[in-house]
UniProtKB/Swiss-Prot annotation:
GO molecular function, one term: glutaminyl-tRNA synthase (glutamine-hydrolyzing) activity
Official protein name in the record: Aspartyl/glutamyl-tRNA(Asn/Gln) amidotransferase subunit B
Keyword annotations: ATP-binding, Ligase, Nucleotide-binding, Protein biosynthesis
Catalytic activity from the UniProt record: L-glutamyl-tRNA(Gln) + L-glutamine + ATP + H2O = L-glutaminyl-tRNA(Gln) + L-glutamate + ADP + phosphate + H(+); L-aspartyl-tRNA(Asn) + L-glutamine + ATP + H2O = L-asparaginyl-tRNA(Asn) + L-glutamate + ADP + phosphate + 2 H(+)
Species the sequence originates in: Bordetella bronchiseptica (strain ATCC BAA-588 / NCTC 13252 / RB50)
């Protein structure tokens, strides 16, 4: 039997506010345990929550960016459950009336564009954290404890429809969402610090079946690689279980990266188990049209708009435009390079950034902001390819030297110091061709007998004689002339 995977994602995006969603405590990461929790965060009697306007503003910005409906009136609700790191015994969230409803997010899986519908985005507070190596007893023995620094940190939970059908598609969506929230400046996107965490709802069903299978939820995956592996494992587990005559149980599971498996955490609750009801201490969040308009006026150019502009203004293919707008920094880098080149050369800039630059960044695990070769420096190098000073092949060697900081990272200085200037004198190239032809009569005859590989062999020998510095286009043209 052929199976189809059905995936929906819930993403907890930590909003980049200086203070918590309902209190004035700092949201700074890495402070000593329980040094950033006040009476509201600790749920002390008599303390009352006050809504953080900045958190609401970031939610509005997100809603506008994805084309969702920003609710003129949304309500905070108490989500009741017990957990050691939840001091109030409930979490303040939104249920029936979220701040954003609907919206879409488009992204590429390989070179295929996909669009996923969003169900909602709602504001809520984060819980605290259980720690097992930060506390000790009076005797000095290690002890577990609760750190409430994170309690009350503002989150925007973004929920998709169950429309994704592969782990690769889910990861591509998560990457696109991550890029968007960082692009908008509403989240720092630091997955190691927990600023962007995904819950994956996974089920399987026979291909062609309309009804969904029983889903499990994989909680708090904070790595794109782990998200893909967790979904793949869970889908395989469910398929094998069903094919062996078992039944999938609705439950919450955790992904164990060391064992590359998911394991049961607890039975999965339904909404009614949380006994949601409106929080009596918080008034409804009322968002007037003037507030929405003010946020819209301050919006940056969105990735989708910039992709369209790159296609229209620079003639880039849709895939290239998508790759170059994965972050504002990458888009700005490309545009700075393209503007420093002659008209019509933007595709060459795109090829270099998606090729040599991206590969080197990935290898060194750096972001474009940390690239030692600036946009201006890369443009200077590409201009030397365009004007024929060096070949594309030699340019890659020059780029590596620039990245390493040789000669101050200056392309012209490296070319001069290494003697890499391309030979474009037709007389000098012609003389080298004559020598190679005279030394290889058998290969010449093979070419004239119709063997194309023989031509490539001759080109290789000519380039070797020129130490790679002969203009490849001129070599090809002159060689064809001489061979008749």
């Amino acid at each position: 039997m052929n199976w189809e995977i059905v995936i929906g994602l819930e993403t907890h995006t930590q909003l980049s506010t200086d203070s918590k969603i309902f209190s004035g405590s700092s949201t700074r990461f890495g402070a000593a345990p329980n040094t950033q929790a006040n009476a509201v965060d600790l749920a002390l009697p008599g303390s009352l929550p006050v809504m953080n306007r900045g958190a609401a503003e970031r939610a509005i910005l997100f809603g506008l960016a994805v084309g969702g409906k920003v609710a003129p009136r949304s309500v905070f609700a108490r989500k009741n459950y017990f957990y050691p790191d939840l001091p109030k015994g409930y979490q303040i969230s939104q249920y029936e009336l979220p701040v954003v409803e609907g919206g879409t997010l488009s992204f590429f899986v390989g070179e295929e564009e996909k669009t996923v519908n969003l169900t909602r985005a709602h504001l809520e507070e984060d819980a605290g954290k259980s720690l097992h190596d930060e506390f000790s007893l009076a005797s000095g023995a290690p002890a577990s404890g609760i750190d409430l620094n994170r309690a009350g940190t503002p989150l925007l939970e973004i929920v998709t429809e169950p429309e994704m059908r592969s782990a690769a598609e889910a990861v591509a969506y998560a990457r696109a969402l991550h890029s968007l929230v960082v692009w908008l400046g509403i989240c720092d996107g630091n997955m190691q610090e927990g600023s962007f965490r995904c819950d994956a709802n996974v089920s399987v069903r026979p291909v062609g079946q309309k009804e969904f299978g029983t889903r499990t939820e994989i909680k708090n995956v904070n790595s794109f690689r782990f998200l893909e592996r967790a979904i793949l494992f869970e889908a395989r587990r469910q398929i094998e279980l069903i094919e062996d005559g078992g039944t999938v149980v609705q439950e919450t599971r955790l992904y164990d990266a060391d064992r590359d498996e998911t394991r049961s955490m607890r039975s999965k609750e339904d909404a009614h188990d949380y006994r949601y009801f409106p929080d009596p201490d918080l008034p409804p969040l009322v968002i007037g049209q003037d507030w929405v308009d003010a946020v819209r006026a301050g919006m940056p150019e969105l990735p989708a708009a910039q992709r369209a502009r790159f296609e229209a203004d620079y003639g880039l293919p849709a895939y290239d435009a998508a790759q170059l707008t994965v972050s504002r920094a990458m888009a700005d880098y490309f545009e700075a390079v393209a503007r420093a080149l002659p008209a019509g050369q933007a595709k060459l800039a795109a090829n270099w950034i998606m090729g040599e630059v991206a590969a080197t960044l990935n290898r060194e695990e750096k972001d474009i902001d940390a690239a030692p070769v600036s946009a201006a420096a890369l443009a200077a190098l590409i201009n030397r390819i365009i004007d024929g000073t060096i070949s594309n092949k030699i340019a890659r060697d020059v780029f590596a030297a620039m990245w390493a900081g040789e000669n101050g990272g200056d392309a012209d200085a490296i070319i001069a110091a290494r003697g890499l200037k391309q030979i474009s004198d037709s007389g000098a190239i012609g003389a080298m061709i004559d020598e190679v032809l005279a030394a290889n009569p058998a290969i010449v005859e093979e070419y004239r007998a119709g063997k194309q590989k023989a031509f490539n062999s001759l080109v290789g020998q000519i380039m070797k004689a020129a130490k790679g510095k002969a203009n490849p286009q001129q070599v090809n043209e002159l060689l064809k002339e001489k061979l008749g």
